Amino acid sequence: MPYIILEDQTRLYYETHGSGTPILFIHGVLMSGQFFHKQFSVLSANYQCIRLDLRGHGESDKVLHGHTISQYARDIREFLNAMELDHVVLAGWSMGAFVVWDYLNQFGNDNIQAAVIIDQSASDYQWEGWEHGPFDFDGLKTAMHAIQTDPLPFYESFIQNMFAEPPAETETEWMLAEILKQPAAISSTILFNQTAADYRGTLQNINVPALLCFGEDKKFFSTAAGEHLRSNIPNATLVTFPKSSHCPFLEEPDAFNSTLLSFLDGVIGKS
């Protein structure tokens, strides 16, 4: 199994598929790079598709330190440097979008040529005057308590809410298996950190072309959250998926892959 070892000796699992301009897929909280498996066979014909499991997730080391969005972004920086990747497209789903934004805030876009944001608002928390956050304080406490005391029903409900239509039992089983690879101590730590993250004030700093992909079934986010991003990110394109909730790349993979290819072809053609 391919791993890269970070400076703090944490091993991150990754896979590469295809060659060409690199697309680094960054998964959401509790998840893994395996959630992007429906992209690799199509996109790898023209691009180098990379799945990376963030620290504490999937097949990566379950270290008990470093579980913040800012550290995950630094891990991405170290990964890109070690792999000698340039002109990278960062594709972040859910919490992965926070990692993309934090990366650009910390390091700029010297080796990044585009960003793909998949179903994520600028903050998950319901700050005063902010209507696009799925968590209030009571909801966050409930989620963290469930992870520590009775995680299985919470995770099963979480998976169901990620889809507009209930996924097949076999689909639910492999997704649940991926989530359960993560110890509860890590799950609750990163859930708290990512829920408190707030990128509303830095969206205007994103100075690479950005594709915004949102499901129209608003179990997690409404398309209005995507419209807010489009209004605040200088060079952003919003595409919505009518049969999707939180996972258009799994729920409507053909439409998602086609949309991503069209966006990338336009960006690469202009670079």
From Swiss-Prot:
GO terms for cellular component: membrane. This is AB hydrolase superfamily protein YdjP. It comes from Bacillus subtilis (strain 168). The active site is at S94, D217, H246. The gene is ydjP. It holds the Pfam family Abhydrolase_6. GO terms for molecular function: hydrolase activity. InterPro entries: AB_hydrolase_1, AB_hydrolase_fold, AB_hydrolase_sf. The keyword Hydrolase applies. SUPFAM superfamilies: alpha/beta-Hydrolases. It is an enzyme of class 3 (hydrolase). Induction: Expressed under the control of the sigma-W factor SigW.
